[in-house]
Amino acid sequence: QPQKCQREFQQEQHLRACQQWIRQQLAGSPFQSGPQEGPWLREQCCNELYQEDQVCVCPTLKQAAKSVRVQGQHGPFQSTRIYQIAKNLPNVCNMKQIGTCPFIAIPFFP
């Protein structure tokens, strides 16, 4: 299972659009990179998730969140936000059968 999801994560280029979407949400200003970016990014991110095997959606989102956190040198508060944004993405993408990912939004796990 983990290997398979790891592979999907790599195939989907580490959910690049989802990582950008998370960053954008974190910054709290969707207009930073132009207003047309927000909805477009969300759509791209959702498409990345739709490509994946359902069982991999949450594990790969967790990886994406981790990448964002590691790249950004975020403090504990922001780290928590990153995971909260990531775990809610299946809802944002209307993936009702997945809903909110079960991983916990805490900053300190590896």
Curated annotation (Swiss-Prot):
Statement: the UniProt record of this protein carries the keyword Glycosyltransferase: no
Example of a GO MF term: nutrient reservoir activity
InterPro entries: Bifun_inhib/LTP/seed_sf (IPR036312), Bifunc_inhib/LTP/seed_store (IPR016140), Napin/2SS/CON (IPR000617)
Record has Disulfide bond as a keyword: yes
SMART domains hit by this protein: AAI
Positions of modified residues (Pyrrolidone carboxylic acid): Q32
Matches recorded under Pfam families: Tryp_alpha_amyl
Keyword annotations from UniProtKB, A to Z: Disulfide bond, Pyrrolidone carboxylic acid, Seed storage protein, Storage protein
Superkingdom to which the source organism belongs: Eukaryota
Disulfide bonds: C5-C56, C18-C45, C46-C93, C58-C101
Main function: The small, basic, water-soluble napins are one of the two major kinds of storage proteins synthesized in the seed during its maturation.
Family note: Belongs to the 2S seed storage albumins family.
Other noteworthy facts: Napin 1A and 1B are minor component of the seed 2S albumin. The sequence shown is that of napin IA.
Subunit structure: The mature protein consists of a small and a large chain linked by disulfide bonds.
Record's protein name: Napin-1A
Organism in which the protein naturally occurs: Brassica napus
